Amino acid sequence: MDSATTSGAMELVAALLRGRVPPELMGGDGAEGRALVATLAAAVLGAALFVLWRRAAAGKKRKREAAAAAVAEATEVKARAAKGGEDEKAADDGRKKVTVFFGTQTGTAEGFAKALAEEAKARYDKAIFKVVDLDDYAAEDEEYEEKLKKEKLALFFVATYGDGEPTDNAARFYKWFTEGNERGVWLNDFEYAVFGLGNRQYEHFNKVAKVVDEILTEQGGKRLVPVGLGDDDQCIEDDFNAWKEALWPELDRLLRDENDASTGTTYTAAIPEYRVEFIKPEEAAHLERNFSLANGHAVHDAQHPCQANVAVRRELHTPASDRSCTHLEFDIAGTGLTYETGDHVGVYTENCPEVVEEAERLLGYSPDTFFTIHADKEDGTPLSGSSLAPPFPSPITVRNALARYADLLNSPKKTSLVALATYASDPAEADRLRFLASAAGKDEYAQWVVASQRSLLEVMAEFPSAKPPLGVFFAAVAPRLQPRYYSISSSPSMAATRIHVTCALVHETTPAGRVHKGVCSTWIKNAVPSEESKDCSWAPIFVRQSNFKLPADPSVPIIMIGPGTGLAPFRGFLQERLAQKESGAELGPSVFFFGCRNSKMDFIYEDELNNFLEQGALSELVLAFSRQGPTKEYVQHKMAQKASEIWDMISQGAYIYVCGDAKGMARDVHRVLHTIVQEQGSLDSSKAESFVKNLQMEGRYLRDVW
């Protein structure tokens, strides 16, 4: 309805209300005509008012959107200007620049990088510290060298995960850096230090940090202190603090004047805190929300997951088993999400209701309390320097925030204990918390918190007077709940609109006596599929690419080793091979070593594996049952029995794939493979080791381990 039409309608209504009825409307019986006129007047008036309301509402929406866009643009311009101005100021006033790089998977490396930068800013007022995500440092690979040549002093915080791999945000830099041997010596004026984050239980402990440190030295860089080897299996914060204390004297030498008055200044880290505003429920509905879950996003990643419904869920173990393993299918039709065989899926799920209710009780907040959360002040300037991570979307209720974004079940870090101590009203509890976080309390923290696997909520229950405000709780006490990664157990050739997950339930008793239920595995086990209810479960998910891929040539032989849920990617492999065979491809030999406890309890996908054998996608299935029969048999034992066949396949160019537990199974399999190569190839130990390493370098020995 245009403006002319609206105007005409209003004139007609006005005429009717004044009693002036157009003659053309008064045909026939007078009473009937008057009734018709009254009805028409009401209808026209209603339509006109509706149009005016829509126009006013649209105008308000456009104003809100324009205001929001203006604020966003102003904020971005302000940030760019501040960032550029800071760099220019550093160059103009002669202050030295220190770049602090980080490569992080869960946020710990980023947290250490920002914490060090904050403390360094307080120690060295004549230097500027800039914290940089390695992935954001260069838009193109070629820019890495160009930019690094301009750096004089840099600190690297890099984590290692999986099978000695870099984190997602460091992968591009690491690939460029490790493949550039032809650069020679080019970092002559470059000084650096590296701190690594890893877990000593894994075979390639801190591999990424060690490699980066070694190559920096080889290419001319000057190492300030030995590479720091943070061990998350113990207390990685202690490792970080020890490395940091060794670093300060070197930075003092480079960044301080002899008469610097701040030399003896004691630094006390501020407790990070988001700005939180509590709002009424009726106000929450009028505020814009940005959950970053809109399906059809150009790129789905950890920051931009898509919403996927659970289509299928079924138990894979038999009733005779005392454990549980779930087959789950996410429906990705219409989401824009795609995957390849061998990829991983990242799943964001929620803490279970009883855990959330306990957190609400300990914090003292009503579950339905609405609030907004911000990393800046009301005037737009950032809070706490640069140490705060971007907050989660809001407005949100306390219950939903605790369910979706707070890691409540892992053991608290020492920085969390310090934050709790600050807000403990009982002096004795505050002192105890500070002691556990101190160097003097190192052994007790290691025993009472780490070894006992006490969760954050268990620790908070022991210190009930510690009730931090929400802004502190989410910034300094509870880490952000991280996505859980699973090897996709399907192939798009067979299931293009579904992502299959094979998940073992985590349900165990900790040394402190708590029954620990895995956050994601519990959610998966209890998920409601769409085949059972229209009100089905859903989760934000995304795909992470993997190099765990079948050979490009399907005729190349493959050896697969994957007990338990390590079967997952191989189910996808075999679906892919079956599709290739049905398309006329000639398949090479394939053998799969699978293990479980008992064929009557946890032999998952048994019928499917037998079908792959019958259809020719799989040549041989070798089974190992650890709790069936007089002796325990594992996949590595079966490999030793098949040593000759394995060596023959390797000699024919076979690819070897291992999936499953990194701490036990993968190590044992690696040792057996080394023995097979040594004995079957008549090689000494060092040559056998070189042979296996070459297989890895050639991409013929791949591992998907956790």
Swiss-Prot record:
The EC code for this enzyme is 1.6.2.4
Residues in Flavodoxin-like domain copies: 98-248
Q: Where does NADP(+) bind?
A: 323, 565, 626-627, 632-636, 668
Per the record, membrane topology reads: Single-pass membrane protein
Q: Which parts of the sequence lie on the Cytoplasmic side of the lipid bilayer?
A: 54-706
Q: Which UniProt keywords apply?
A: Endoplasmic reticulum, FAD, Flavoprotein, FMN, Membrane, NADP, Oxidoreductase, Transmembrane, Transmembrane helix
How are cofactors bound according to the entry's free-text note? Binds 1 FAD per monomer. Binds 1 FMN per monomer.
Q: State the protein's purpose.
A: This enzyme is required for electron transfer from NADP to cytochrome P450 in microsomes. It can also provide electron transfer to heme oxygenase and cytochrome B5.
Which protein is depicted?
NADPH--cytochrome P450 reductase
Q: Which family does it belong to?
A: Belongs to the NADPH--cytochrome P450 reductase family.
Binding sites annotated in the UniProt record for FAD: 484-487, 502-504, 518-521, 706
| Compartments reported by the entry | Endoplasmic reticulum membrane
Q: List where the protein spans the membrane.
A: 33-53
Give cofactor(s), names only: FAD; FMN
Task: List the gene name.
Answer: CPR
- According to the entry, what is the taxonomic lineage of the organism? Eukaryota, Viridiplantae, Streptophyta, Embryophyta, Tracheophyta
User: Which reactions does this protein catalyse?
Assistant: 2 oxidized [cytochrome P450] + NADPH = 2 reduced [cytochrome P450] + NADP(+) + H(+)
Positions contributing to FMN binding:
104-109, 159-162, 197-206, 232
Query: What is the top-level taxon of the source organism?
Result: Eukaryota
Q: Which GO terms describe its cellular component?
A: cytosol; endoplasmic reticulum membrane
Q: Which residues form the FAD-binding FR-type domain?
A: 303-551
EC class of the enzyme, as a word = oxidoreductase
A single GO molecular function, which one? Answer: FMN binding
- Lumenal compartment: which residues? 1-32
Q: Which InterPro entries match?
A: CysJ-like_FAD-binding, FAD-bd_FR_type, Flavdoxin-like, Flavodoxin/NO_synth, Flavoprot_Pyr_Nucl_cyt_Rdtase, Flavoprotein-like_sf, FNR_nucleotide-bd, NADPH_Cyt_P450_Rdtase_alpha
Keyword check for Secreted, yes or no. Answer: no
Q: Which organism is it from?
A: Sorghum bicolor (Sorghum)
